[in-house]
């Protein structure tokens, strides 16, 4: 697979829409232990949007992040036989704390969107967008 070094172009309006979707779903997060409520919205190459929130578990290793929840939902919804292709991932913390994906989520995003951009609110309130290849410069691939 070839990885395009150019970021996927996402309009400002689309970025804001994805962030709003992520913010809305962060309200549904189940985070009784960390109190870190995260929402995510992904945009696929076929222009569909999927959302997910983090779901914690008493056995911490079984916790699932918002990004992976959204990606796994998109995979479960696909019925065309093609591999999921992510264009953008927006991540929001319910309390406004800037948050970028954890390492595990970066790897999963890279698997399904090697040219994806990650969108999140920076500490100054501006919208940050970073290619996944900058967040995970040497992602693991078997193909």
Spans of model-derived segments:
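C-terminal binding/interaction regions
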Residues: 2-31, 83-143
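Short beta-strand scaffold segments in enzyme catalytic cores
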Residues: 35-44
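Short glycine/serine/threonine-biased micro-segments
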Residues: 37, 50, 59, 101
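Structural signal for short hydrophobic segments within the conserved structured cores
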Residues: 50-53, 128
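Compact, glycine-rich, soluble single-domain proteins
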Residues: 54-69
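Phosphate/pyrophosphate-binding loops at sites that engage ATP/ADP/AMP, CoA/4′-phosphopantetheine
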Residues: 76-83
């Amino acid at each position: 697979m070839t990885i395009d070094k150019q970021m996927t172009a996402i309009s400002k309006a689309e970025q804001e829409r994805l962030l709003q979707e992520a913010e809305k779903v962060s309200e549904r997060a189940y985070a009784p232990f960390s109190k870190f409520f995260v929402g995510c919205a992904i945009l696929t190459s076929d222009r569909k949007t999927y959302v997910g929130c983090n779901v914690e578990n008493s056995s911490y290793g079984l916790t699932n992040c918002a990004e992976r929840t959204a990606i796994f939902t998109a995979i479960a919804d696909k019925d065309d036989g093609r591999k999921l292709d992510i264009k953008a991932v927006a991540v929001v913390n319910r309390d406004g704390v800037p948050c970028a994906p954890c390492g595990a989520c970066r790897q999963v995003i890279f698997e399904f969107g090697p040219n994806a951009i990650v969108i999140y609110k920076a500490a100054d309130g501006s919208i940050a967008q970073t290619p996944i290849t900058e967040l995970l410069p040497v992602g693991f691939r078997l193909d």
